[in-house]
């Protein structure tokens, strides 16, 4: 820029609209067309594109109908809580719409048989099993910059081991190395993710902070950078078992939206994750239907429009599984009442005392 363009205008009588136009044209000449614009001038900027999580209840709790594209998502929780299952179901939903998906398997633990059962098209899933954290994040950066990938999952942040740690000896102390790696990578990635409209899901693990007297001792790995860059953070927990007589056939799962830049946060939803099947859609229809008043519950009996679905929740689920048209009708009614259901999620899942950090990040 020339010195004249940097001159500060001090005259109070100057026409502000003309001064603004001159400034905008100067910025566009220097940095290219589209480097600055009025937000409402481009309708595509305002609209939020989403991809379903595979859980109707979670889609409603997120407030925008699913996970937003062009954003960073973090899914964290204890071991065997359903983190990878939720990510794989999001991939399956994206593939149903013709999207291209990639899975960076830093843990080297992806089970292709289980992924296929969840509906993932393995023939069209890109997979990488990198040796180091730097390699994993370089691959992620290259795929995002290509603009051809719709959903990219990194499993997990805890397994992104810096090269210096791998080449060093056991017992070497390298404090903050992984946190610095994540901080640098996210600084590079965030603009590319927004421009390419790629959804990047980071799966994360939980660690315990030593010496915490008050509040939750839990924290996620990889430093604080991901907490700030993530538009949505999901805390997923196993809260019980789903049994058929004495046999355990699934997990009762609770997901809490601890951070959400797209809609009000702190909503929580509960659903069943069945072994070899994923999220139980029929179970969600029964539970959400009762919550919204669409499905009537009288004693142990469930009914819809005076038609009995079954005695007991499992029988009602079986009936809906055998009658997909009726299940689709209930789902349509639930989506039309999504606002009402979301308000009830907020009432049930207000912020816990431990969520102060998450609230402060917003």
Swiss-Prot record:
GO terms for cellular component: cytosol. This is Protein RecA. The keyword DNA-binding applies. SUPFAM superfamilies: P-loop containing nucleoside triphosphate hydrolases, RecA protein, C-terminal domain. SMART domains: AAA (SM00382). Belongs to the RecA family. ATP binds at residues 77-84. One of its GO terms (molecular function) is ATP binding. GO terms for biological process: DNA recombination; DNA repair; SOS response. Keywords: ATP-binding, Cytoplasm, DNA damage, DNA recombination, DNA repair, DNA-binding, Nucleotide-binding, SOS response.
